[in-house]
């Protein structure tokens, strides 16, 4: 049986931390920022940890 390939789109969007959690960037932070207040845009530029519901699925996609 051949090796599993990692999902290239998922590899570009998600990174694994040293503790094994999955880090992701927030959406809605790249354009149309004049409509959003400063607090919101500042928060949108920070990365966050993926919640547990999708973590197992994304790990399988990244590690292949």
UniProtKB/Swiss-Prot annotation:
Domain of life according to the entry: Bacteria
Protein name per Swiss-Prot or TrEMBL: Large ribosomal subunit protein bL35
The keyword Methyltransferase is annotated on this UniProt entry: no
Gene3D superfamilies reported in the protein's UniProt record: 4.10.410.60
GO terms assigned for molecular function: structural constituent of ribosome
Keywords (A to Z) from UniProt: Ribonucleoprotein, Ribosomal protein
GO cellular component term, pick one: cytosolic large ribosomal subunit
Similarity annotation: Belongs to the bacterial ribosomal protein bL35 family.
Native organism: Chlorobium limicola (strain DSM 245 / NBRC 103803 / 6330)
Coiled coil segments of this chain: none
Single biological process term from Gene Ontology: translation
InterPro entries tied to this protein: Ribosomal_bL35, Ribosomal_bL35-like, Ribosomal_bL35_CS, Ribosomal_bL35_sf
